[in-house]
Structures are given as structure tokens and as C-alpha cells.
């Protein structure tokens, strides 16, 4: 299974330098967001993709499908994380079936 990465040019470059092979970079224009939507749909339909990493900023602008497979994870970009603690707890609960408490 492959990991695909979708995000802004800086995030994409970082993952390329780290050795990721399926890395897709998108700007913020409406045309770029349309490209990102199309690429995400394509990646979800591929059998060889197991995980899709998408920056939180891009995920807010595209239609992220709710699918069990491949796993779609939102990651912070250079501006930091937009998730609060409660949202992160909910993601973990859905992923592993256990609620984390302090």
C-alpha cells in the first residue's frame, strides 16, 4: 500500500525531500482547488493507496469523502494545526474505538 500526500507547495516539498513518492502540490486559486478535488477522488478510487495525508487547510477547501479505506488523515501545514483538543480526541476515538481522557 502506498501513502499519498496532498497539500501546499511547502508541505509537498518537505514530503518529497523525506522520500514520499505520491506527492501532489496545490495552490489556493479556485482552479487549483478543483484540481485538488479531482485528485482526491482519483486517489480514493485507487486500490494501491492505503493512506492519504492532506493538509488541514486544503481539507477545509475540498470535499473530503467519508470512506473507511483508504484512511484520510488531515495534517498541519506551515501555519500550524487548526484542530482543537476535542476534535483530535474524536478523531482518535473513531480511529481506534477508544475515548482518551485526561
From Swiss-Prot:
BP terms from Gene Ontology: proton motive force-driven plasma membrane ATP synthesis
GO MF term (any one): proton-transporting ATP synthase activity, rotational mechanism
Major subcellular location class: membrane
Membrane topology per record: Peripheral membrane protein
Gene3D superfamilies associated with the record: ATPase, V1 complex, subunit F
Keyword Protein biosynthesis annotated: no
Record-linked Pfam families: ATP-synt_F (PF01990)
Statement: the UniProt record of this protein carries the keyword Cell membrane: yes
Subcellular location as annotated: Cell membrane
PANTHER family hit by this protein: V-TYPE PROTON ATPASE SUBUNIT F, VACUOLAR ATP SYNTHASE SUBUNIT F
Role of this protein: Component of the A-type ATP synthase that produces ATP from ADP in the presence of a proton gradient across the membrane.
HAMAP family reported in the protein's UniProt record: ATP_synth_F_arch
Protein name, per record: A-type ATP synthase subunit F
Organism listed in the record: Thermococcus gammatolerans (strain DSM 15229 / JCM 11827 / EJ3)
Gene that this sequence comes from: atpF
Amino acid at each position: 500500500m502506498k501513502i499519498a500526500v496532498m497539500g501546499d507547495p511547502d508541505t509537498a516539498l518537505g514530503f518529497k525531500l523525506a522520500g514520499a513518492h505520491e506527492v501532489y502540490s496545490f495552490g489556493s486559486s479556485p482552479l487549483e482547488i478543483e484540481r485538488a478535488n479531482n485528485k482526491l477522488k482519483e486517489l480514493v478510487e485507487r486500490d494501491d493507496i492505503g493512506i492519504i495525508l492532506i493538509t488541514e487547510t486544503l481539507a477545509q477547501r475540498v470535499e473530503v469523502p467519508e470512506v473507511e479505506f483508504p484512511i484520510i488523515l488531515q495534517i498541519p501545514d506551515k501555519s500550524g494545526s487548526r484542530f482543537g483538543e476535542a476534535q483530535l480526541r474524536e478523531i482518535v476515538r473513531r480511529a481506534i474505538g477508544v475515548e482518551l481522557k485526561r
